[in-house]
């Protein structure tokens, strides 16, 4: 199940957390994996651990020219990208009434506009080959909202609308477009929470635990596989029941 041998995947934001887990899981399923990120040393460490079938593609997603070059280089070096995982994202949290234009623009540029640009770059060759899997990592807050994150929530909600629209445009070319929406996932950020904060979070989650990055990555592996050929325009929520959507 979920066999990906010979498929070529590009994973953005692969230098840690969920992105790293996605890269590891896709590689374990047999894919050739392109690792994108800005922390080159971390990418090199991950590549060394994975061994063969790995290529590195460092780039700044807030730079229009670098995004275009990333798509072109990945397509050339991987000899065709079959699977695109738009995972990279940033936050610039703050109350809406105090949010600066820069904080809004920066988050939307990386989390949404770069997704548009990179996906556009790689969709054309996918259409020519009549095969592709585009998987966008959004968030539960893209559906529920979250105070202090109007910019981030807007970017993640935008990804969902983007994915549904694109899915309808290119379905006849055997290209699927889907989202995976994580909830609270164990990470370096959640490790910094104190016990009281963690208890408050757990109380809101029916499973009474946080998810793991591997659980998110497993949903990505499914959507990337042939088994998900009839699934498009959908959002898989990996949140332990925090939001039953």
UniProtKB/Swiss-Prot annotation:
Alphabetically, the GO molecular function entries are: 3-oxoacyl-[acyl-carrier-protein] reductase (NADPH) activity; NAD binding
Keyword NAD tagged: yes
Database matches in InterPro entries: 3oxo_ACP_reduc, NAD(P)-bd_dom_sf, Sc_DH/Rdtase_CS, SDR, SDR_fam
Q: Which UniProt keywords apply?
A: NAD, Nodulation, Oxidoreductase
Residue numbers binding substrate: 139
SUPFAM superfamilies recorded: NAD(P)-binding Rossmann-fold domains
Q: Where is the active site?
A: 152
Q: What does this protein do?
A: Proposed to modify Nod factor fatty acyl chain.
What the record says about family reads:
Belongs to the short-chain dehydrogenases/reductases (SDR) family.
Specify the protein name.
Answer: Nodulation protein G
Q: What is the lineage of its organism?
A: Bacteria, Pseudomonadati, Pseudomonadota, Alphaproteobacteria, Hyphomicrobiales
């Amino acid at each position: 199940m979920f066999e990906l041998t010979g498929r070529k995947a590009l994973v953005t934001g692969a230098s840690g957390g969920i992105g790293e887990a996605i890269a590891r899981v896709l590689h374990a399923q047999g894919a050739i994996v392109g690792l994108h990120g800005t922390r080159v040393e971390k990418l090199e460490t991950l590549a060394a651990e994975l061994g063969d079938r790995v290529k590195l593609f460092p780039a700044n997603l807030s730079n229009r020219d670098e995004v275009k070059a990333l798509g072109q280089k990945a397509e050339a070096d991987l000899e065709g990208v079959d699977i695109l995982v738009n995972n990279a994202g940033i936050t610039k949290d703050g109350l809406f009434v105090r949010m600066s234009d820069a904080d809004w623009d920066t988050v939307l540029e990386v989390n949404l506009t770069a997704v548009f640009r990179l996906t556009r770059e790689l969709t054309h060759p996918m259409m020519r080959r009549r095969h592709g899997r585009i998987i966008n990592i959004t968030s539960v807050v893209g559906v529920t909202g979250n105070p202090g994150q109007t910019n981030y929530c807007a970017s993640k909600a935008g990804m969902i609308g983007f994915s549904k629209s694109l899915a309808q445009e290119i379905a006849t070319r055997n290209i699927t477009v889907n989202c995976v929406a994580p909830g609270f996932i164990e990470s370096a950020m959640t490790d910094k929470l104190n016990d009281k904060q963690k208890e408050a979070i757990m109380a809101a989650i029916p499973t009474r635990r946080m998810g793991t990055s591997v659980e998110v990555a497993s949903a990505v592996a499914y959507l990337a596989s042939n088994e998900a050929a009839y699934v498009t325009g959908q959002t898989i929520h990996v949140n332990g029941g925090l939001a039953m959507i």
